A protein has these predicted regions:
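Helical segment within the ABC ATPase nucleotide-binding domain
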Residues: 172-185
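ABC-family P-loop ATPase nucleotide-binding domains
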Residues: 88-145
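Catalytic Walker B motif of ABC-type/P-loop ATPase nucleotide-binding domains
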Residues: 157-161, 166
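The feature captures the beta-strand-to-loop junction immediately N-terminal to the Walker
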Residues: 39-44
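Conserved structural motif at the start of ABC-family nucleotide-binding domains
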Residues: 11, 26-28, 81
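Short coil-to-beta microelement around the adenine-binding A-loop and adjacent beta1/P-loop entry
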Residues: 23-24, 78
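Conserved ABC transporter NBD signature motif
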Residues: 58, 62-75, 79-80
Length: 195
């Protein structure tokens, strides 16, 4: 059974440990995150935030116990990613792609993508279907990423430095949109930031 029940944690880590050569990034780390929470991992460079995210997403090997939405990200990553969305701090869209093509692509690869919902989000921005990424400001690119992600019915949204490089007004708009249009008691948001 893969459904996350309201009394079960979305993420549960016990003794999470990861070393890179001689550098210990995570040292016997324990944490638990329940459904319907917004959690921020805040700290300086080298604190282990990105390493923890990579473990949660099943992108790196690690020691210890880690369960995400009732699954082991090391062995059940493909299944897990049906219920997880991720925006990386270095998330890049091809500069040649148009808004409509980005929507088409995500619709083709993610079974829980709602095209109509994405188009509604985009209608509230300055983005136009024929606009190419190379014609967009950084803030507009973030709006496109956000529209694509918010249109996926995911239980866990993982954001790594999602507002990096944005001015204070765009940051505020980003988080307001996320809270008002996406977040609810069934969804969990995990954010890392230095800010």
């Amino acid at each position: 059974m893969n459904a996350v029940l309201s009394n079960h944690p979305v993420i549960s880590a016990r003794g999470l440990r990861k070393a890179y050569k001689n550098k210990l990034a995570l040292d016997n780390t324990d944490f638990e995150i329940g459904p319907g929470k917004i959690i921020g991992l805040i700290g300086p460079n080298g604190a282990g935030k990105t390493t923890a995210l990579k473990a949660v997403l099943g992108l790196i090997p690690f020691e210890g116990e880690l369960e995400v939405l009732g699954r082991d990200p090391r062995t059940q990553r493909d299944d897990l990613m049906n219920d997880v969305c991720f925006i990386a701090d270095v998330a890049v869209l091809p500069r040649w792609i148009r808004v409509s093509e980005a929507i088409e692509f995500v619709a083709g690869v993610h079974p829980r993508f709602d095209r109509a919902k994405c188009e509604r989000f985009i209608a509230n921005t300055q983005l136009k279907p024929k606009m190419r990424v190379r014609e967009m400001s950084k803030g507009m690119i973030v709006q496109l990423h956000l529209a694509l992600v918010m249109a996926i019915d995911a239980k866990l949204l993982v954001l790594a430095e999602p507002t990096l490089g944005l001015d204070i007004l765009m940051r505020k708009q980003f988080y307001e949109t996320l809270l008002n249009e996406y977040f609810d008691e069934q969804r969990t948001i995990l954010v890392t930031t230095h800010q």
